[in-house]
Amino acid sequence: MRGQAAAPGPIWILAPLLLLLLLLGRWARAASGADIGPGTEQCTTLVQGKFFGYFSAAAVFPANASRCSWTLRNPDPRRYTLYMKVAKAPAPCSGPGRVRTYQFDSFLESTRTYLGVESFDEVLRLCDSSAPLAFLQASKQFLQMQRQQPPQDGDLGPQGEFPSSSDDFSVEYLVVGNRNPSHAACQMLCRWLDACLAGSRSSHPCGIMQTPCACLGGDVGDPASSPLVPRGDVCLRDGVAGGPENCLTSLTQDRGGHGSAGGWKLWSLWGECTRDCGGGLQTRTRTCLPTLGVEGGGCEGVLEEGRLCNRKACGPTGRSSSRSQSLRSTDARRREEFGDELQQFGFPSPQTGDPAAEEWSPWSVCSSTCGEGWQTRTRFCVSSSYSTQCSGPLREQRLCNNSAVCPVHGAWDEWSPWSLCSSTCGRGFRDRTRTCRPPQFGGNPCEGPEKQTKFCNIALCPGRAVDGNWNEWSSWSTCSASCSQGRQQRTRECNGPSYGGAECQGHWVETRDCFLQQCPVDGKWQAWASWGSCSVTCGGGSQRRERVCSGPFFGGAACQGPQDEYRQCGAQRCPEPHEICDEDNFGAVVWKETPAGEVAAVRCPRNATGLILRRCELDEEGIAFWEPPTYIRCVSIDYRNIQMMTREHLAKAQRGLPGEGVSEVIQTLLEISQDGTSYSGDLLSTIDVLRNMTEIFRRAYYSPTPGDVQNFVQIISNLLAEENRDKWEEAQLMGPNAKELFRLVEDFVDVIGFRMKDLRDAYQVTDNLVLSIHKLPASGATDISFPMKGWRATGDWAKVPEDRVTVSKSVFSTGLAEADDSSVFVVGTVLYRNLGSFLALQRNTTVLNSKVISVTVKPPPRSLLTPLEIEFAHMYNGTTNQTCILWDETDGPSSSAPPQLGPWSWRGCRTVPLDALRTRCLCDRLSTFAILAQLSADATMDKVTVPSVTLIVGCGVSSLTLLMLVIIYVSVWRYIRSERSVILINFCLSIISSNALILIGQTQTRNKVVCTLVAAFLHFFFLSSFCWVLTEAWQSYMAVTGRLRSRLVRKRFLCLGWGLPALVVAISVGFTKAKGYSTMNYCWLSLEGGLLYAFVGPAAAVVLVNMVIGILVFNKLVSKDGITDKKLKERAGASLWSSCVVLPLLALTWMSAVLAVTDRRSALFQILFAVFDSLEGFVIVMVHCILRREVQDAVKCRVVDRQEEGNGDSGGSFQNGHAQLMTDFEKDVDLACRSVLNKDIAACRTATITGTFKRPSLPEEEKMKLAKGPPPTFNSLPANVSKLHLHGSPRYPGGPLPDFPNHSLTLKKDKAPKSSFIGDGDIFKKLDSELSRAQEKALDTSYVILPTATATLRPKPKEEPKYSINIDQMPQTRLIHLSMAPDASFPTRSPPAREPPGGAPPEVPPVQPPPPPPPPPPPPQQPIPPPPTLEPAPPSLGDTGEPAAHPGPSSGAGAKNENVATLSVSSLERRKSRYAELDFEKIMHTRKRHQDMFQDLNRKLQHAAEKEKEVPGADSKPEKQQTPNKRAWESLRKPHGTPAWVKKELEPLPPSPLELRSVEWEKAGATIPLVGQDIIDLQTEV
């Protein structure tokens, strides 16, 4: 009865716990078996989301699997701890180290690397069967058991399973929360801890280091069957709550049964009621523990008590059960003997029963066989009715003594505290010990371990770096194919490195081929081929594709199914021919035919990546046309490389690695952006790079420096350069990229303000934006104004900023007093110079009329108590309806707002007009602000494609007048050819070119390349016009000072007029790289950056130098000893007056031109330019054409020439019909002579004639040489006389000519160059003596060369000359032979008519004529009489009437013939008659102008002679002999002997200063087309 009543208690307690364990075990088995099976080879089991489970090695690691693992995942290592209990196999492992157990943090699948690996092989020791149980505690993410190598064939049982004696172990796992663990989990964990510590020893420490549960003491028998009975929430030791160690101490003491104190145990649970109804009885008991060492110590009180139960009356059918029980007596049994009878939670209750009771039973045997014990007796109360009760106890106890001495068993003392961990880092050991009190009187020794050991792990060891190491290779997997060729592989894992060690090197997987046997291969369809082309491109067609059957092989089955299939295609409507864009070759790319609405794509150029897109669209008439291609997806290689480098740095920053090289990336991007962007995709790429840089700055990866901040802002400025305008327009096609720019700058201000600790104020001024950053505390903050005092701007556009921003100090208040004391605010203000033109807000009627200003405050305030004040200066005049707008991406579309505003909104800002040029905006939020204005009806800001009418009129009038002047000069160039004329024509060309470029520049503002070229050339021609004015002044100065001598001066004029402007422009373009040449509004130098000084500076210098030269020329004109030549003085005065008038007018013209070009809205500047430009053209024509006397005379002569040509008086012609051309000199002489054709020539004196064409004054040093040297004689004429003409010497004295009536001197031109005429006869000696005696006289003699038109001169028949002068017109030439008949009293000796050998001095002619035959003996010489005295009577030109066809030997000169065409005699007669009454006084006025002509022609002839020297083969051929009937004077060419009057030994003559020296012609290699006729046309004998 007593055992039956006590049994239900423990069963009721254990039933729920056993049920829970059973369910969890089955759940774990089901989860584990879901992923594995006997047939799988690669078996992996992952357990997660479970808190308790069980598995066996045979289920998880099947025998035929090559590599298996079991993994338990911790839900959260910070909140849960994993515990494992392993029941080892009874026999040791056949393969040691086959199964490994470890924990790790994570596993990288790509590299097969375990991170944070910690092995538990040392803790579990699965192959050590000496400890049947092993426990471990894991705190990382994963706990894994993995079989490293498969079992060998000898290890497998008969069914291929693990033998139970080797590797058949079982595992229980438990997941316990670190805080407030569950009661059931703590019960199981405490049992595990108890078993772990019970079996722990030095060789096998306990693997459970600590528990979150408060384990309580209780009866611990078999850990697997004896549940712990909780006694409270904590474990007590000496009255203090402790941990699991205290609980384990109590458990051990209770298990030994030797308590230190006696007394009653707690009451057991109430037993079963004796009756179902009508009142029954329940009882409960308790146990008395005797006090050790106290003799006779017992417990006072009853051992058992009862109470009534089921008091309900029984019904008619009710039954009452009556059972009898005997009361238990108190004994001294040990606790273990009571077993499950020991109950708890009992409460005393009065016994009830019948008044009559039975008698006491006999006393029981003494409870102790030795020493003091207890005896008990009991009685029963017999109930007779329900109203009576038994009085008194039902059981009694008494002490009893036994004479035998009781044995005292050994007892354990308290456990010592746990020792310190044996290792300060890594895995170590802790232990504790206890002392056993020795047994006495044959007692039993102490049971249980004397020492307990467990693992400990305080911290990770920070030792040296540990490199990652590979685990062993797994075995080769089963061949992937059961037959034919297959693959096998094996893998290995890497234990991750620690403390910065190196990664595992090598591959984690290896593969190899395997072949088992040939397999029968069925036929298998290959993949479908791609669909073929549609049968029609539109209107409905079909496509076909097919597949190929591979096989069958080795007896396999054939392929099943169709081999090809069809589908419909091309259902769209066919486009009409006019709806297709034709193939086009545009931008060096061939664009194929594309239907309208589609986009064609081609690869970007080689220097970029991506695609060029071009859309085909329909116009309003439905005709397809190509749109311009877009390069929005093209990114240059340099920008792409920078973008990839930045992304790599950002990836490192996100992983927390140290950063290096960020500053170099920013510097490289700055250098690339300064060179400009090639494509619109470069802009988007740069924004992406800057965005990534901002993210890098935000992290601890890299701290930006002030240089990085400056480079960052400069890069943004480079993006906003004018040359990127068209690329920004393309970039807007992919979305509003302006908001990305605003967001980028805002994030940059935030990052820089808070990442740079030493930052207070920062100003960054660039060409296109100004950035201001202020960092200030909230406490004591004042109003912030932009720009601040002490503005340090360097750019021209930002030196005097017209836009202002005021941020009230109320913005810097957070509303919390504590926060305001420590808060720091960053205020960023950005002023964009030209961003408004990139935002596509400019329309036909509206325009962004201000710069764009962005204001940022970090951290952003909740609201603005005081509005933000922004003052804008208007950019355009003539606008109305100024409206403040702000950038608001969150603002929805408003019905009242125009659709073109986009994210711009006018809500939140109030407009306050200040004046006509300024507007104030009061805004209640922080954003980006600007002003939108309405254009007036007559104004539009669109780019005009044609210049204004005013500019066209001004440039046209000026250019036409100057062009007319150039045409006039060209038409009369042979009359007015001079250096001054050359300078004037160059000056006019520079002005005409400037006017044309001004008009072209007005139409090319959108074409960047053309506009830049126009600006550069306009700069060049503006400067050249100033330089040519300076050149004219310089020429005048050199003329008045007499230094205008050589052709080198002319080259200097060209260098000054064209070279100096070209040098200035080249230097400007080189230094600026063409930046500043052209802007978005005009094709001229930018007004900012200082490039305009490249024009203003040189122009001002030219004006200053011109003034200085003008002053010097003026002083020369007004001084007494200044210019004596009246003509030169007049020219110098005209040049000075021209400079004084033209130069100021030129400066005003170009100044107004610059203003008109740069400000196209101003009509005043355009009108001023038109007036000044037109006036300049008229003034230049007036000064240099209408008022210039030379031009007037030249025009008159030109008109006369045209009239004469119309009348047929052409001045002679060749025999073959070609017109004979006059030289410039002949024409000028003819011009000067025509005005006096019918005058009396009697007044013309010999001195006048000879002094007209005298040689220009020589330099002083040459004059001195001539004065010291011997007087010139006829014996040594200048060599160039025979080559070109007879040119008078200024040093020849002209005395009265002697009367030689019977002698004549005939000079004929020979083809050989540099002929010398040498005479030693008496007549020449006489002439020499006469000339030397008359040297002191002032008259100069000259050789006069008459023009070609002298054939029309009319002779004066009435003139009777004193001297017999015969003028013989030579046939074929215009050479006039003047001969004087000698008197009879003046005998002369005629030299033989033969040519001296050599024909000339050896150093002169380059080609020697053929050797002549032996000459005849010379005739006897006659003495020369003294010459008669010549009176200074004016000679007259007489006409002999017929030419001297056969000059006799008395001619006195060796004549040479020329093989040229014969001139008509009638033409010569007409010219003679025309010059009969010539007034040679008029010829003197043209002498100065013709001096240079003579020099140039002389150089030409000299150069031709040198050419003949260089090519001897061409001139050494003998001339073809002509028949006598064609040439009357052929006999003159017959060779003769050397005459007696020619000196046989010629001494070398010193070069005469009168001889014109040869100067290299402009092009040395050019062939000068001069024939004999051209040379002879210039010679005339006087």
UniProtKB/Swiss-Prot annotation:
Knockout consequences: Viable and fertile with normal brain anatomy but mutants display severe deficits in hippocampus-dependent spatial learning and memory that are accompanied by enhanced long-term potentiation, impaired long-term depression, a thinning of the postsynaptic density at hippocampal synapses, reduced protein levels of Dlg4 and increased Dlg4 polyubiquitination. Smaller myofibers than wild-type animals and impaired muscle regeneration after injury. Impaired bacterial clearance following E.coli infection.
Cysteine pairs bridged by disulfides in the record: C273-C309, C277-C314, C288-C299, C366-C400, C370-C406, C381-C390, C421-C456, C425-C461, C436-C446, C479-C514, C483-C519, C494-C504, C534-C569, C538-C574, C549-C559, C581-C616, C604-C634, C884-C921, C909-C923
Region span, Indispensable for interaction with MAGI1: 1579-1582
SMART domains cross-referenced by the UniProt entry: GPS, HormR, TSP1
Biased composition (Low complexity): 319-329, 1441-1455
UniProt tissue specificity: In brain, widespread expression in all neuropil-rich zones including spinal cord gray matter, cerebellar molecular layer, cerebral cortex, thalamic nuclei and basal ganglia with no expression in white matter (at protein level). In the cerebellar molecular layer, highly expressed in interneuron processes whereas Purkinje cells and their dendrites show weaker expression (at protein level). In the olfactory bulb, highly expressed in glomeruli (at protein level). In the retina, highly concentrated in the outer and inner plexiform layers (at protein level). Expressed in brain.
A UniProt-annotated Pfam family: GAIN
Bias-annotated ranges (Pro residues): 1389-1435
Membrane topology: Multi-pass membrane protein
Species in which this protein is naturally found: Mus musculus (Mouse)
Positions of post-translational Phosphoserine modification: S1467
Ranges of residues in domain GAIN-B: 760-939
Keywords associated with the record: Cell junction, Cell membrane, Cell projection, Disulfide bond, G-protein coupled receptor, Glycoprotein, Immunity, Innate immunity, Membrane, Myogenesis, Neurogenesis, Phagocytosis, Phosphoprotein, Receptor, Repeat, Secreted, Signal, Synapse, Transducer, Transmembrane, Transmembrane helix, Ubl conjugation
KW Transmembrane helix (keyword) present: yes
Subunit structure: Interacts with ELMO1 and DOCK1. When bound to ELMO1 and DOCK1, acts as a module to promote apoptotic cell engulfment. Interacts with MDM2; the interaction results in inhibition of MDM2-mediated ubiquitination and degradation of DLG4/PSD95. Interacts with PARD3 and TIAM1; the interaction is required for correct dendritic localization of PARD3 and TIAM1 and for dendritic spine formation. Interacts with MAGI1, MAGI3 and BAIAP2. Interacts with PHYHIP. Interacts with DLG4 (via PDZ domain). Vasculostatin-120: Interacts with CD36. Vasculostatin-120: Interacts with ARRB2.
Task performed by this protein: Phosphatidylserine receptor which enhances the engulfment of apoptotic cells. Also mediates the binding and engulfment of Gram-negative bacteria. Stimulates production of reactive oxygen species by macrophages in response to Gram-negative bacteria, resulting in enhanced microbicidal macrophage activity. In the gastric mucosa, required for recognition and engulfment of apoptotic gastric epithelial cells. Promotes myoblast fusion. Activates the Rho pathway in a G-protein-dependent manner.
Glycan-linked positions: N64, N401, N607, N692, N844, N877, N881
TM annotation in the entry: 949-969, 981-1001, 1009-1029, 1053-1073, 1094-1114, 1137-1157, 1167-1187
Protein's recorded name: Adhesion G protein-coupled receptor B1
UniProt site positions, description: Cleavage: L926, S927
Region feature Disordered, mapped onto this chain: 313-335, 1382-1549
Intracellular or extracellular location(s): Cell membrane; Cell projection, Phagocytic cup; Cell junction, Focal adhesion; Cell projection, Dendritic spine
